[in-house]
Amino acid sequence: MLFLVVSTPRPERPSDLAKTRQSFWPWIANYQARGVCRHAYARVGRGAVAVFDVEGNNALHRILNEWADIIPAHFDTYPLVDVEATKRMLAAQVAAKKK
């Protein structure tokens, strides 16, 4: 299952958490190396976004709890559909309409 996660850190001063924040990138790199995190980007100003490919909600829940231990934040999560799956669904809809 694909999920887009948008983090909005708590309003602490960024400089107060700089040392802790440095550990985020090696942590997320571990998930990238395993193919669990497909993309990760810092947001302008504060926060980050990432696309995760996980087995289900429990796996995502575990990852977000780990993330929050590094950088306390609010997370907006959006389930995504793979492009190829979307193309197949649209083709099936077109084929069904022709019948």
What are these regions (language model features)?
Residues 1-99:
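Conserved, structured core segments of small domains
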